[in-house]
Amino acid sequence: MDEHLARHRLADLFLDTFAFNAHTTATEALWVGLPVVTKLGKGFAARVAGSLLTAIDLPELITETVEDYEALILDLATNPERLAAIKQKLAENRLSKPLFDTELFTKHLEDGYQQVYQRYYDGKLPEAIVVPTQHLLFANHQ
């Protein structure tokens, strides 16, 4: 596994695919400190990397158009100071944000389940829920 994860350290950026985002591979890249650039799509499979980046508080790496995706990649590739700042933020956030903090992630998930159940119990129709916390969690990029 160490060799598998070490390969990410050879890259400067992880460029996500559009129709089907990286799932485990993007998570592994973030774990070892490799920034992931993604473009949100419409379906679940095209929004996974955006959720991962939101959960680690790096929304600046989420784009919504191909043009913005390309521009962000070019900016990061030609601006080593900005890329270094993002890598530093990723390193700082790795163990303090919900993505890799299992206890915090579980608390947020449980809070979400409580909201869903309460809506059901109150006879309300399903709708998108937001788990309010002091930390950034799965922002509504739609």
Give the location of each predicted region:
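Short acidic loop-to-helix transition motifs that present clustered carboxylates
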Residues: 1-3, 22
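C-terminal amphipathic helix plus adjacent low-complexity
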Residues: 6, 72-142
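Catalytic binding pocket for nucleotide-activated donors in carbohydrate/polymer assembly enzymes
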Residues: 8, 17-102
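An anion/phosphate-binding loop that grips the pyrophosphate of nucleotide cofactors and donors
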Residues: 11
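Receiver (REC) domain switch-region micro-motif
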Residues: 14
